[in-house]
């Protein structure tokens, strides 16, 4: 039976009396106009259907069959996925990646693992997340989520670019440390600070010159004291100022005997007075740092603190020796003065105290520390070369009457200065065989020294650039904060996340 050009087919019984149960969909008329004539072609299809169904009690009405072209074929029931099994499409500058939501949710603190963070990049029209970032790098970023926290840099991605991607996707400090370790970078030492507020202030004051203006002032004073101490150490050796404290035999008329006395006492020496002033500052600085340090064990492991201790020991040793000499016989005073001169020589190590306030010396020390293996190989190669060539030159010159090489140990000095390309000329071979040995020794020395030098230079460049980057990073936060505050004050807007349809909206607060 045809009604209005429609064929009969079975449809489920629908209650059209309640029009609220019919959902609005684009392209379908849902406005039931009661004023429309019954069966009028211009009326709504649903209103006409309502009339036809109400007039017949049989379910197989004229409107109960529709053409097969307009009916969707029956299919399987839809499977409702839980949140963890949902697929997520990530578009990286046009290259689409697909993963599951539970894979990203393993790391909720990251950009992709945090829903609110990643929703800022959601494209509701395409139902995907779009990032205008480096495409090859995302292979390593996605592998981090899939592997449960293993970071691997793709071979075709530079180190600095991949490091920027790790920072952008907020993978965290552990991922960055793992990446730097895999790439062969040396891990930065952790900075320990005292828990006590007063101790922390004094520790920063004396240990970190860049922490405040007062710390920089203390650093300037320390440098001046070190310079004065080194200057005094050098000036007192001049002939017009030198005081060797030579012993003089003086006859005592009262006792009718002779005794040995010093030409000048140490306590009347102006250099000793200046030295005492410097030692007071060094001791005060060392004791204060030891009291407020966060770890007493680490304090004695620090090479700089050991240098500070060694630099003040000669003064107290000299003071004790001077006091003891007043009661010791003259025979032991000569030995005491010899020991005293050796102890005073240790004062030269005070020059290393400047490295505490010099970034260049610190970089040099870190380079030597990181290159200990290469330096050990260099010394080992030199040792082999010295033994080999000193033996060869001895046997080449053994029959020469005027030879400088009377034994193999005498040839050690010649081999060292030749392999290091110094060549003093105080010892030289005279026979043709000895000259051939000398030529081979010089060539071997050049090759031995040149091999580890590139590694040492590479370590120096690494520490130098790392220190430069750290200084730049210290200046960046303040500049960024200033720019953000300036922009925020001009725009007067704050960004808020609108979770409707996965979008992100901006609410502007106008004053």
Swiss-Prot record:
- Give the InterPro entries listed for this entry: BTB/POZ_dom, Ion_trans_dom, K_chnl_volt-dep_Kv, K_chnl_volt-dep_Kv1, SKP1/BTB/POZ_sf, T1-type_BTB, VG_K_chnl, Volt_channel_dom_sf
GO BP annotations listed = action potential; potassium ion transmembrane transport; potassium ion transport; protein homooligomerization
Membrane-crossing ranges are 218-238, 271-292, 303-323, 339-358, 375-395, 436-456
The consequence of residue 200 to H is: In a colorectal cancer sample; somatic mutation
Alphabetically list the UniProt keywords: Glycoprotein, Ion channel, Ion transport, Lipoprotein, Membrane, Palmitate, Potassium, Potassium channel, Potassium transport, Transmembrane, Transmembrane helix, Transport, Voltage-gated channel
User: Coiled-coil regions in this chain?
Assistant: none
Q: Where on this chain is Selectivity filter (motif)?
A: 421-426
Which residues bear sugar attachments?
256, 334, 498
Q: Where is this region: Disordered?
A: 22-50, 489-511
| Activity regulation text | The channel activity is up-regulated by cAMP.
Q: What is its main location?
A: membrane
Q: How does it sit in the membrane?
A: Multi-pass membrane protein
- As annotated in Swiss-Prot or TrEMBL, what is the tissue specificity of this protein? Detected in kidney, in proximal tubules, glomerular endothelium, in vascular endothelium and in smooth muscle cells.
**Recorded GO MF terms:** delayed rectifier potassium channel activity; intracellularly cyclic nucleotide-activated monoatomic cation channel activity; voltage-gated potassium channel activity
Superkingdom assignment:
Eukaryota
Location comes to: Membrane
Q: Which Gene Ontology cellular component terms are annotated?
A: membrane; plasma membrane; voltage-gated potassium channel complex
Q: Which Gene3D superfamilies match?
A: 1.10.287.70, Potassium Channel Kv1.1, Chain A (3.30.710.10), Voltage-gated potassium channels. Chain C (1.20.120.350)
Enumerate the Pfam families for this protein: BTB_2, Ion_trans
Tell me which residues bear the S-palmitoyl cysteine lipid modification.
Answer: 293
Quaternary arrangement and interactors, per the entry? Answer: Homotetramer. Interacts with KCN4B/POMP. Interaction with KCN4B/POMP is necessary for the modulation of channel activity by cAMP.
**Record comment regarding domains:** The N-terminus may be important in determining the rate of inactivation of the channel while the tail may play a role in modulation of channel activity and/or targeting of the channel to specific subcellular compartments.
Give the record's family classification: Belongs to the potassium channel family. A (Shaker) (TC 1.A.1.2) subfamily. Kv1.8/KCNA10 sub-subfamily.
The free-text function statement in the UniProt record for this protein reads: Voltage-gated potassium ion channel that mediates K(+) permeability of excitable membranes. When opened in response to the voltage difference across the membrane, KCNA10 channel selectively allows the flow of potassium ions across the membrane down their electrochemical gradient.
For this entry, the protein name equals: Potassium voltage-gated channel subfamily A member 10
Taxonomic lineage from the root: Eukaryota, Metazoa, Chordata, Craniata, Vertebrata
């Amino acid at each position: 039976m045809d009604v209005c050009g429609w064929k009969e087919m079975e449809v489920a019984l629908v209650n059209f009396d309640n029009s609220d149960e019919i959902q609005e969909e684009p392209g379908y008329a849902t406005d039931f106009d009661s004023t429309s004539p019954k069966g009028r072609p211009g009326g709504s299809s649903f209103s006409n259907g309502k009339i036809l169904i109400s007039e017949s009690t049989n379910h197989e009405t004229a409107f109960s069959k529709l053409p097969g072209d307009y009916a969707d074929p029956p299919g399987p029931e839809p499977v409702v996925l839980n949140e963890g099994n949902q697929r997520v499409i990530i578009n990286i500058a046009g290259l689409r990646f697909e993963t599951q939501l539970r894979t990203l949710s393993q790391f909720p603190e990251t950009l992709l693992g945090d829903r609110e963070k990643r929703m800022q990049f959601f494209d509701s029209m395409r139902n995907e997340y779009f990032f205008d970032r480096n495409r090859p790098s995302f292979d390593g970023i996605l592998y981090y989520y899939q592997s449960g926290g293993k970071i691997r840099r793709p071979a075709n991605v530079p180190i600095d670019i991949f490091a920027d991607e790790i920072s952008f996707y907020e993978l965290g400090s552990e991922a960055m440390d793992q990446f730097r370790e895999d790439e062969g970078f040396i891990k930065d030492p952790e900075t320990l600070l005292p828990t006590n507020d007063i101790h922390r202030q004094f520790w920063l004051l004396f240990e970190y010159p860049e922490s405040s203006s007062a710390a920089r002032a203390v650093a300037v004073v320390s440098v001046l004291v070190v310079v004065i101490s080194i200057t005094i150490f050098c000036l007192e050796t001049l002939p017009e100022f030198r005081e060797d404290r030579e012993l003089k035999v003086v006859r005592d008329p009262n006792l009718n005997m002779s005794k040995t006395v010093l030409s000048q006492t140490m306590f009347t020496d102006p250099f000793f007075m200046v030295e005492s002033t410097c030692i007071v500052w060094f001791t005060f600085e060392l004791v204060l740092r030891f009291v407020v340090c966060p770890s007493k064990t680490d304090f004695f492991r620090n090479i700089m603190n050991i240098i500070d201790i060694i630099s003040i020991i000669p003064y107290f040793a000299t003071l004790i020796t001077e006091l003891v000499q007043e009661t010791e016989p003259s025979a032991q005073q000569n030995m005491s003065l010899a020991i005293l001169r050796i102890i005073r020589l240790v004062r030269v190590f005070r020059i290393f105290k400047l490295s505490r306030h010099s970034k260049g010396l610190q970089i040099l020390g870190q380079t030597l520390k990181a290159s200990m293996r290469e330096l050990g190989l260099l010394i080992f190669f030199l040792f082999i070369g010295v033994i080999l060539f000193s033996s060869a030159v001895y046997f080449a010159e053994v029959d020469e009457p005027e030879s400088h090489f009377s034994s193999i140990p005498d040839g050690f000095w010649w081999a060292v200065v030749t392999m290091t390309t110094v060549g003093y000329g105080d010892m030289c071979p005279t026979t043709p065989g000895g000259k051939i040995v000398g030529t081979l020794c010089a060539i071997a020395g050049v090759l031995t020294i040149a091999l580890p030098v590139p590694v040492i230079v590479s370590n120096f460049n690494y520490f130098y650039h790392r220190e430069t980057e750290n200084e730049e990073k210290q200046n960046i936060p303040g500049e960024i904060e200033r720019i953000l505050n300036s922009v925020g004050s001009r725009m007067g807007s704050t960004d808020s996340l609108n979770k409707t349809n996965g979008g992100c909206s901006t609410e502007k607060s106008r004053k």
